[in-house]
Amino acid sequence: MLPQKRGRIPSRIAMSCYWKVLAIFSLSLPSALSFQPAQPRVLLVSFDGFRWDYIYKVSTPNFHDAMENGVHVKQVTNVFVTKTYPNHYTMVTGLYAESHGIVANEMHDPILNETFSLNKMDVYNSKFWEEASPIWVTNQREGHKTGAAMWPGTDVKIHGVFPTYFMPYNESVSFEDRVARLIHWFTSEEPINFGLLYWEQPDEMGHILGPENPLMGPIISDIDKKLGYLMSELKKAKLWDVINVIITSDHGMSQSSSERLIELDQYLNRELYKVIDHSPAVAILPKEGKLDEVYEALANAHPNMTVYKKEQIPDRLHYKHNSRIQPILAVADKGWEIVYNRSDSFQFGNHGYDNILPEMHPIFLAVGPAFRKNVTKEVMNATDLYPLLCHLLGINPLPNNGSFNAVKDILAEEFPVALGGDTYATVIGVFLGSFLVMVFTAVFLKHFVLTHANTMQMQHTEAAQPLLQD
């Protein structure tokens, strides 16, 4: 028997056990971390023309349920002009209209010598959209997937990119079918992390009836039911508790009257100019050499119409630094309409007025795990939505006119602005895993040192015994 070898067996066994346990732990750690929640998911919903105060005009239980379980912003200052295409593009770029280039629903680009019109196929001309890059382009370039159900611009190839999945615009497609498609995209084997949903109402009926018409009540109630349907379908798909939903609009609506018409024919010969975009913010292109003549004829023509040369447009409107903004802009006061004459078609509701007017402001609700509950915020700018969306998605925002700091107070807790592909669960999981490895290593080393020390003591004792026996 060799006493000096007695301590080696325990140390070898301990070392063998250590490496086995460490190997098992290392193999199991990725599996444990894989149970983290899925990537952040966001659904952006726009009910076109849903004015901020519609929720108080009739019973809207589903809107109020979202308010109680999320965030409600009372006044959202959208961008001028307060029309559909400029504001929908602002929401997904964070830019003023003069910066993103979609300056109106109807446009003429003097550099391209081309027009853009909602009533023609011109809206699919990529050149009009590429002064900015919408959020779905960034989202996909950072490795994620986007799904869009009729959102303006999502069926246009912008910078060579379509959304991963999209529905070509077709007004006849029902709200329910749009929701079903989005649910499918969110729950597929390769799911989207960002969805966009657009619905044409209550804008269409708001134009026909006017926002103050009692007949708008059933229209608003129907929108509330559609929101309830969306919430129900998200719950059925087990998405409601994990998805962040933002419910908003592009603009509000103002009541018009046939008694409040400004007739251009009373002041100016039509041969001198062309109207590019229509009431209540009228973009006027004078014939060559007629700029001053047209301006002077209109400048003081009517007390309820303000006329600007392009360079005179107030800075607060952020609406003069783009070639698609016409040389003259005529803006009607709230409730007034600018027409050629009384034979023109007339609508009882309209938008496009100064964005300082509360009647032009849209609804804004946000509900989901990222948001505080039952919180009311007084004001925000529509441009702030884009950096908020980028934050929620964990992607890096492009330069924009918004401010994340202006809206971060609606979030449930602070997160880094851009986490890339990593979620907080990943960060926490890696930290805890590393910590456990360190603790395990420390405990083992302590055990190993103590065992080794005991072995040395045993060796020393047995080596000394023959001398004692002598």
Please provide the spans of the model-predicted regions.
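Acidic/histidine-rich catalytic neighborhood
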Residues: 242, 249-289, 421-423
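Cleavable N-terminal signal peptides of Sec/SRP-targeted secreted and luminal proteins
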Residues: 17-33
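Short, structured active-site-proximal loop/turn typified by the sulfatase FGly-forming signature C/S-X-P-X-R
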Residues: 52-100
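Metal-dependent active-site segment of extracytoplasmic phospho-/sulfohydrolases and closely related
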Residues: 44, 62, 222-263, 330
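A long, amphipathic alpha-helix that forms part
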Residues: 37, 172-187, 193-195, 202-243, ...
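Active-site neighborhoods of enzymes that stabilize oxyanions during catalysis
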Residues: 273-376, 380-388, 452-464, 468-470
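Active-site-proximal N-terminal segment of extracellular/periplasmic enzymes that hydrolyze or transfer
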Residues: 30-72, 468
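His/Asp/Glu-rich, glycine-adjacent segments
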Residues: 17-18, 82, 94-211, 303, ...
